[in-house]
Amino acid sequence: MDILIVENKDNTISDLKTILQVLGHKVIGLASNGKVAIKIAGELNPDLILINIKLNGEMSGVEAAKFLVSLYKIPIIFITVFTKNCLTKSLQLPDDAVTISEPIRKEHLEYCISRVLEN
């Protein structure tokens, strides 16, 4: 599966790339903010996007994800340090949003990928 990572922390990017490679996926692009993510997604057409809820720049990860889904219909997994209950209420994530908490663990990422692909 071709995956776009939208993340502003180098250590998280490194962890994700390593885990995704072990799981047999290919990271086809990296972006550190929402505007770049939207541009890259349009150019590379990833199968899945992993996006941090808190991004640098004018656009949050949630705002960027809304654009990405409406423009390209690409499944999204949100990366966060918060719990899902906290996020659903404070950031108005949909109830069916798939989130993964940092630190990223291989088994959890594998589970999240399978969940998002079911929808």
PLM regions: where:
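C-terminal output helix
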Residues: 86, 104-117
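Hydrophobic/aromatic residues positioned on beta-strands within the core alpha/beta folds
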Residues: 79-80
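Acidic, metal-coordinating helix/loop segments flanking the phosphotransfer/catalytic sites
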Residues: 30-48
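Two-component/phosphorelay signaling modules centered on CheY-like receiver
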Residues: 9-29
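Active-site residues of response regulator receiver
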Residues: 52-53
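As written
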Residues: 91-100
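Acidic catalytic/metal-coordinating carboxylates
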Residues: 33, 59-63
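Short amphipathic alpha-helix used as the core "switch/output" element in two-component signaling
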Residues: 62-73
